[in-house]
Amino acid sequence: VRGDDGSTEYRFAARRLSLDHWHIDPESITRHASAPHGEDTGASDGDGDGDGSDAELPLDALDLVIELRTALGLSEQVLPVYLEEISSTLSGTAFKLAAPPVDAAELARSGFQAVETGMTEGHPCFVANNGRLGFDIAEYHAYAPEAATPVRLIWLAADRAHATFTASAGLDHDTLLRAELDPATLDRFADRMTELGLDLADFHLMPVHPWQWWNKLSVTFAAEVAQRRLVCLGYGDDEHLAQQSIRTFFNTSEPSRNYVKTALSVLNMGFVRGLSAEYMKATPAINDWLHGLVARDEVLRATGLAVLRERAAVGYHPAAYEAASAKGSPYRKMLAALWRESPVPLLEPGERLATMASLLHVDRDGGSFAAALIRESGLDPAEWLRRYLDTYLTPLLHCFYAYELVFMPHGENVILVLDEHGAPRRAVFKDIAEEIAVMSPDTPLPPEAERIRAEVPEDMKVLSLFTDVFDCFFRFLSGILTTDGVLDEDTFWAAVADCVTGYQKSAPHLADRFERYDLFTDRFALSCLNRLQLRDNQQMVDLQDPAGGLQLVGTLENPIARFR
């Protein structure tokens, strides 16, 4: 690979796998001085004789990006921010490598949160996948998932006249808070309000990320605090751990209590990670609809699929910032939170949990988490893979073909329920309201959930499966299992094809849809996710029209086409 001006050249050894996946030997990567385009060095064999043009240069990731800025399409506005994201990602990688080593086999036997904080990759599709711009080094150690530092959330009281609380049917604000906070904590909060001459009954309680309070709200919302529309009540008592998605917390003091997802105004992987107060209004209704659909559908019940409902949400509406900013602006996403069900109460005796992203974890010695699970299970690798596909892929196929319902089913949004030996039993989907879409005008939705209906061109609908499942997850998992010698590529993709075929045979009434949205087509469009971030790392896609902003470049050979 030559730099834009031809003055540098990168060389490496790679094994090319399905879906144009390059498994690169990191030890083989070298950087060399090279004659600029159009200059004749007099060296015809590339050995650099006579001009020193083949001299080896030190490797530097920032230099690589700068030398390829034109080829990568990086604008003057995006480039420095992208360099900062790369630097932060490398810093995080260095932190992980400096930690005491835990091999993949040991991690595969560990508990849910040890796996969550011990894995190395959440989104390998993106190069700059751990930007977290806004954290200083102390905040990184306090709040990064891999730091595994216990966090106590800050609680605010928000004047009900300026805040919106919504909840699932049968759940109200007071019932939720009595379940989420100990009586002593609630009493302390109420006493603080009384000291200020205020009545807690006139306010909604809101959990806040500590970073958001100290770096954003305490200054940006100073007027709201001065007017006592917002009252800081201090830290809660429960300890939490940040999850791979960075702004969501798992309660380690009481694991059966809800996850808490908070607004966090840091730039991370293409977005400022706030939460929209406006979006929060419909969140419980969307989750109730999906939960009801899964409960009623025989196929989904048979797969064991569960969804973690976002049972309640609260958002604060700062009048000045809402008047001054457009819909979708980070200024409208500074103060909101939601409560999502914990997966712990779903477990049966002997079962354990692992975020699906962990299947892509490889330890510093090259050991694979997925391979370790397979060995631990005692199953033939092909049988382990079949069980995994039954729990993960089959529900996605059915939701797409029966309802034109799609998820964002990347590794951080799926939790696997494993048996005591590490074999997959069922899948749990999460991050519902912000990530799902219904592409059919005919699938009935309650009025309050209509925002998830999306207009998508017919020829792009099935791309959600090809891109999000095949290219963004199976490509990496297949590559890991293949290079680890666990399964060859043909066996992996044949198993995927068998899962698709098995589902299609079980649903002959959907035959016309299988033909219209053909998963066995010879090729499919390549949706380049990194190009989204390279084009605009502040707002990677328009959430109102996600399909309209895709970067489609060429096609990929479908790895299951030959198994039709």
Regions found by a protein language model. Give the residues of each.
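Nucleotide/phosphate-binding site architecture used for ATP/NTP-dependent chemistry
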Residues: 1-45, 50-390, 419-564
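Intrinsically disordered, low-complexity segments enriched in polar/charged residues with Gly/Pro
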Residues: 235-236, 402-404
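Conserved kinase catalytic-core helix
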Residues: 384-403
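Catalytic-loop of the protein kinase fold
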Residues: 406-408
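Canonical protein kinase catalytic loop motif
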Residues: 410-412
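Hydrophobic residue at the +6 position relative to the catalytic HRD Asp in the kinase catalytic loop
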Residues: 414-416
